[in-house]
Regions:
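Soluble, non-membrane globular domain cores that form compact, hydrophobic packing
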Residues: 6-8, 12-283
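Positively charged n-region of N-terminal signal peptides that target proteins for export
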Residues: 1-5
Length: 283
């Protein structure tokens, strides 16, 4: 098991000791003009994102709208990634944001600083970029973000964490994954689509405090359309388990394995769900 360490003329409230505060604006900030607008589909996303398009595609990317704004020599960018559903948008947001640092008074869930704001609303993952991090431009960035987000439908997705994860997980650690790229920063179970998610079947994971002092375990749950598909994924994982993971105890519906560092993991089949727990100190 390989765990990897893991907006310009509006008068707005500026920086506070506890973080950035803002006042929502309704229109494009005075003086700023749209200088460029481009759209990218699934077929040409690689032309914009060099080396990182795959994970967007795995989470259900559909279309990117890129808008650049200028004021003299200054520039701000807006990137709107339309995903196939709210779960996909939340998934890529959580994957990119990591531990969130939200701005106060912002209209949607977000994480950011003066360089970049990440946000998610409905089926859209949004990036608002202040490339040089200039503090005087931050009010204009907020204004552009508020304007862009106001036009996005607020579709409500399923609360998968409440549905699938037991209570008690550590705040800020919950993630969604739809394939190996979303899971890879946490654990490598094997090559390719090892859990047979096909880019459509959702998994959730989060960290929990383990029974040992200072121990942090991770629980992942993948919910399949049927028990038969869950069993097929279970069998595929058993047959193609990463060579760094040593099988210890195996039955028809469970597996205990050990990684190169001596930590344990478990895999169990429960109806149409696979449950994986790893980074366990003792079994």
């Amino acid at each position: 098991m390989r765990r990897k360490p893991l907006f310009a003329a509006l008068a707005l409230v500026g920086f506070l000791v506890c973080g950035l505060s803002l006042l929502a604006a309704e229109t494009t900030p005075e003086g700023w003009k749209e200088t460029e607008r481009r759209e990218y589909t699934r077929n040409d996303l690689y032309g914009y994102i060099d080396g990182g398009a795959e994970i967007f595609l795995e989470y259900g990317f559909q279309k990117l709208t890129l808008i650049r704004y200028g004021l003299g020599k200054e520039e701000l960018d807006v990137e709107l990634y339309r995903m196939d559903n709210p779960e996909g948008a939340l998934g890529i947001y959580l994957a990119k944001a990591g531990r969130e640092t939200p701005l106060t008074d912002f209209p949607t869930r977000n994480s950011g600083d003066r360089y970049q704001i990440m946000a998610v609303k409905g089926s859209t993952f949004a990036l608002f970029n202040n490339p040089e991090g200039k503090e005087p431009l931050f009010p204009a960035l907020i204004s552009l973000a508020t304007e862009a987000l106001s036009s996005i439908p607020d579709e409500k997705g399923r609360d998968l964490f409440a549905e699938l994860l037991p209570p008690g997980f550590l705040a800020g650690t919950a993630r969604l994954f739809r394939g190996p790229l979303g899971l890879q920063p946490i654990i490598t179970l094997g090559d390719g689509d090892i859990l047979l998610q096909k880019g459509t079947i959702l998994g959730v994971l989060a960290d929990y405090a383990g029974p040992e002092k200072g121990e942090i375990q991770t629980l992942a749950v993948v919910s399949y359309p049927s028990a038969q598909e869950a069993k097929k994924a279970f069998d595929n994982l058993i047959a193609n388990l990463d060579s760094y993971l040593k099988k210890e105890i195996q039955s028809e519906d469970s597996l205990t394995f050990k990684d190169f560092s001596g930590k344990f993991g478990t895999l169990s089949l429960s109806g149409s769900r696979l449950l994986l727990r790893f980074n366990i100190s003792k079994i």
